[in-house]
């Protein structure tokens, strides 16, 4: 799962396998797999990624919440590093909307609990208005109320036309959230089912298989 998402994001080179296609508003399809993050941006794809490793890949633990917002807004210029007002406003909005427990927006991220770190990361990535949003275990470490808050945010992204790739382990949640569910076992795709009609036992059978199937996710 980790390698799959990193390959789509352009963070890992792929040796072989089917391509992930992005269809633009004008109907043109482009391969994302095999391209660097810079090449993906040039295609007009605003890709946001909430990795499983929150502090290793997602946020910088020694930096405060505001500075972590600035990292996401940096597009190749220096303005983001000189102007803190917009990142500060975003940090405070995320703290308020996602009920992040922190002394202030200037608190180093490493001092937050795991659940609050996750809220900051998810909030930052969603705030960038992505066309493709990839999330790996976005509610791990969160309480029930916070989890449903994140699920609601993801559903709103879908309503806005964002393509959401959700990696999770709770079958009830996957069936509730996903339009299509791709099952993998030992690094191989074993099946793709309709999330609206899929049953847990059907998915369970696919989880025990180890055979490739053809199809696009």
Language-model-detected regions and their locations in the chain:
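Glycine-rich phosphate-binding loops of nucleotide-dependent enzymes
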Residues: 1-217
